[in-house]
UniProtKB/Swiss-Prot annotation:
Keyword Oxidoreductase: yes
Protein name: Sulfite reductase [NADPH] hemoprotein beta-component
Positions contributing to siroheme binding: C488
Family under the similarity heading: Belongs to the nitrite and sulfite reductase 4Fe-4S domain family.
Designated gene of the protein: cysI
Cofactor(s) it depends on: siroheme; [4Fe-4S] cluster
Listed pathway(s): Sulfur metabolism; hydrogen sulfide biosynthesis; hydrogen sulfide from sulfite (NADPH route): step 1/1
GO molecular function, one term: metal ion binding
Source taxon at top rank: Bacteria
Length: 575
């Protein structure tokens, strides 16, 4: 919302965005949501409450496939809600999964579960009469959707690599602690959705403030050498540093100010890699997390939401100034960055044995969409059947995939046989398909300008043909497609990134790398799928013939001069 409101009489202070007024007048996120729930004349919420329900983990959407048809029939759009669960670190138990699966089948328009790039799941197509029911179900399961959207700290993600399960457990515990510590303290969620007793007017938000944050805030924890969480896509990232003598994490490198969204036509917006602040000990993580959040709370831009993210605050005030303020407020000094190396960002598919002698099976879930829509791939049914017999846990990855975790040696065959029976495991999936992902886009995302999730599978097939033509079947290029420039599928950290411009047309970005530490550059703007395929055929052919040993596609297109590397996106992204 770009409207402004006058918050004071000092004409030297910029007007605040209207979102700030909505938050300020919401009575700690209550607004008139409860009254709107009882309004049966519309399937949605009014404009202000549609903003506030985001803080409760929901987005108001409509089915864009039927928008014109319904308008012709003089009907309002098919308004529905998308709910995103809070699931720090992406761990969910089989019995929780079964209940979610059953609810999605019975009470959503689409009957699917969507795994996200932030290690959680979304339910699309929730109608207003079912909203209280889904929140009550989550509460019964020990889950909620608090702060998975809105101007707050979002779902905290961490490396899901089961190969180092001792380290994974440590970062998962930390992810849960950070998530809980930074949650809104308002009782509005329980009052509205769980019919909890209304509290007296004693709400306060000592960390987030009564107007919460200027914009959404994202936190990730990575365990090198795996960068599956894409540390440079987050406002705040912790990179684990392991003891040389034990399987214990002794501290973290801290990165601040990453973010990938931009606005077409506005060169003051751009994707930005995070800045290295320094190394801290494990005991200081919560204090640093709180302080980075509060500095951004106080210094972030509340007048122009396009410039409200942490990355723009760092650009405006300077990295050194922001870092010094964090040290001053927290009393924690940053030490020099400890050495670390990222070598990969993908998931390890198939069976992997953990150090506790249990096994972990990583399943490829194309675009994270779990459904029974394909009769040859009954993902929903197969995973539900496994949940009925599995005594371990499920882990959702930041690459939209699913890990069946904690499987005993005796149960491996039974679980794998079940998954093969329903087509969940397919040995023919190529490395290229496994390295590709897309955001949801049409028909439910209101921001989508072009297809993404529904476009990607057939597009990947065409890329597979190109790879095969040049005998690159065993190789993979990090490919990401988003329906708009917000980069929910992290296209601005891919080797090949497509961002939607209009139906059937995309911007093509090249030159990111395969470990997520370089932003790609715009190669061609507003082009068709055929244009994209022709460009990729040519550049992949050259890569096959001219590459150095083990050189990735992204590194090749930079070295060969097809695109210039983005070094400092604040200055050279639009060159």
């Amino acid at each position: 919302m770009n409207r402004k409101y006058d918050n004071n009489n000092d004409k030297n202070i910029p007007l605040l965005s209207d979102n700030e007024r909505i938050k300020k007048e919401s009575n700690f996120l209550r607004g008139t949501i409860a009254q709107n729930l009882d309004n049966n004349l519309t399937g949605g919420f009014n404009t202000e409450d549609a903003q506030l329900i985001r803080f409760h983990g929901m987005y108001q959407q409509d089915d864009r496939d039927v928008r014109v048809e319904r308008a012709n029939q003089k009907l309002e759009p098919l308004i529905n809600m998308m709910l995103r669960c809070r699931l720090p670190g992406g761990v969910i138990m089989p019995q929780q999964w079964l209940a979610i699966d059953d609810f999605s089948e019975k009470y959503t328009l689409y009957g699917t579960i969507r795994l996200t790039t932030r290690q959680t799941f979304q339910l699309h197509g929730l109608l207003k009469p079912n909203l209280k029911n889904v929140h009550r179900l989550l509460n019964k399961l020990g889950l909620d959707s608090i702060a998975t959207a809105g101007d707050v700290n979002r779902n905290v993600i961490c490396t899901a690599n089961p190969m180092e399960s001792t380290l994974h457990y440590q970062v998962w515990e930390l992810a849960k602690s950070i998530s809980s510590y930074l949650l809104p303290k308002s009782n509005a969620y329980a009052e509205i959705w769980l019919d909890s007793k209304k509290t007296e007017s004693t709400d306060s938000e000592p960390i987030l403030s009564a107007t919460y944050l200027p914009r959404k805030f994202k936190i990730a924890i990575a365990i090198p050498p795996i960068n599956d969480v894409d540390v440079h896509a987050n406002d705040l990232s912790f990179i684990a540093i392991k003891s040389e003598n034990t399987d214990q994490i002794i501290g973290f490198n801290v990165l601040v100010g990453g973010g990938l969204a931009m606005t077409y036509g506005d060169i003051t917006t751009y994707p930005r890699k995070a800045s290295a602040f320094g190394y801290i000990s494990t005991k200081d993580v919560l204090k640093i997390a709180e302080t980075v959040v509060t500095v951004q709370r106080d210094w972030g831009n509340r007048s122009d939401r396009r410039h409200a993210k942490t990355k723009y605050t760092l650009t405006r005030v300077g990295v050194t100034t922001f870092k010094s303020e964090v040290e001053r407020r927290s009393g924690v000094q940053f030490h020099p960055i400890r050495p670390y190396v990222f070598t990969d960002r993908g998931d390890r598919f198939g069976w992997v044995q953990g150090i506790d002698d249990y096994w972990h099976l990583t399943l490829f879930i194309e675009n994270g969409r779990i459904s029974n829509n394909d009769p040859h791939k009954l993902l929903k049914r197969g995973i539900a059947e496994v949940a009925q017999i599995h005594s371990g846990s499920f882990r959702l990855t930041a690459n939209q995939n699913l890990i069946i975790s904690g499987v005993s040696k005796d149960n491996k065959l039974m679980i794998e046989s079940t998954l093969r029976k329903y087509g969940v495991i397919n040995d023919d999936i190529t490395p290229q398909r496994k390295a590709s992902m897309a955001c949801v886009a049409f028909p439910t995302c209101p921001l989508a300008m072009a297809e993404a999730e529904r476009f990607l599978p057939k597009f990947v097939t065409k890329i597979e043909h190109i790879m095969s033509k040049y005998r690159l079947e065993k190789d993979a290029i990090i490919l990401r497609v988003t329906g708009c420039p917000n980069s929910c599928a992290r296209a601005m950290l891919s080797e090949i990134g497509l961002t939607g411009r209009s139906i059937g047309r995309y911007n093509l970005y090249l030159g990111g790398n395969n470990i997520g530490t370089r932003i790609p550059r715009l190669y061609k703007e507003n082009i068709t799928e055929n244009d994209i395929l022709n460009i990729l055929d040519t550049t992949i052919s050259r890569w096959a013939q001219e590459r150095n040993s083990q050189e990735s596609y992204g590194d090749y297109v930079v070295r060969s001069g097809i695109v210039n590397a983005v070094i400092n996106s604040e200055k050279d992204f639009y060159e």
